[in-house]
A protein has these predicted regions:
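Extreme N-terminal basic, low-complexity initiation segments
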Residues: 4-6
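An acidic/histidine-cluster motif and surrounding catalytic segment
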Residues: 10-13, 17, 22-127, 131-260
Length: 260
């Protein structure tokens, strides 16, 4: 859960900035100083999906439960073949792929589907099936998005080597070297830009969602912002695309997750 003292500190920093609804010239903040502004209107319509693939140890149930406990009332399930949806989640909107897409193709197709199904959303989010979230996250994000006029993506999960000392949204532009696509939330304009970007549409490998999106963000100047401390944690022990053992460790895990 988001600590009260941290929320107050971040809220103070945000209230020091101006709320802007139109385009604005953005000056990059110092490396370890977070954005102190909230741009645009409050998010009221969310369109969030989760990409789900078969695993030896299925974690998607944990992720969906944690996401709903964090304040949302729905999430769209995008399921690869052979995924078994729990009875308790059968009421949620589900898109089942007729044939195996693979990680990247399912991710990009899911982003396009979200835009088509929920065309008037204020925020588009895609999360992966091996994450947990802190409680109160939805309300917190509605109070703090978007952190800058050049925001393309916001991630509430922060890999350990992206951790910053000062709490808040930090610009984290790494181009094709961007790490971890567990919790990407897009502005409506950025979601459409990413879904239709030629490099993204032409990427034909199964892996590297984070790298591809990072390159799009860098080339279009719609940058990633990662929140410190991490408001989500990577929990997956088995990967559907990587051969090594526990992905959710070291740099692939948050070192400062605030807890559920």
């Amino acid at each position: 859960m988001i600590p009260v003292d941290m929320a107050a500190e971040i809220g103070t920093a945000i209230n020091m900035g101006r709320k802007i609804t139109g385009p604005t010239r953005v000056v990059a903040p110092p490396k370890d100083f977070p954005s102190g502004e909230v741009l645009g209107d409050k998010i009221e319509k969310w369109a969030v999906g989760i990409t789900i693939a078969p695993r030896k140890e299925q974690t998607y149930n944990i992720t969906v439960d944690s996401f709903l406990d964090a304040g949302w009332d729905s999430i769209h399930l995008f399921c690869e073949p052979k995924v078994i949806v729990a009875d308790k989640h059968s009421y949620l909107p589900i898109t089942r792929r007729k044939k195996k897409h693979g990680a990247w193709a399912n991710w990009l197709a899911s982003l396009k589907d979200l835009i088509d199904i929920y065309p008037d959303a204020d925020c588009y989010g895609l999360i992966q099936d091996d994450v947990i979230f802190c409680k109160g996250l939805r309300e917190f994000m509605e109070q703090t998005l978007w952190p800058s006029g050049d925001t393309g993506i916001c991630s509430v999960f922060v890999p350990s080597h992206y951790t910053r000392n000062n709490p808040g949204w930090h610009k984290t532009n790494r181009g094709f070297k961007l790490w971890m696509a567990q919790t990407f939330f897009f502005t409506p304009e950025s979601a459409r830009s990413c879904a239709n970007y030629e490099f993204c549409k032409n990427w034909n490998k199964q892996k590297q969602i984070d790298n591809v999106v990072g390159r799009w963000a860098n080339e279009t100047k719609q940058y990633p912002y990662y929140f410190s401390p991490s408001l989500a944690q990577h929990i997956g022990d088995t990967s559907t695309i990587w051969s090594e053992g526990n992905r959710a460790a070291g740099k692939r895990a948050a070192s400062d997750f605030v807890g559920e």
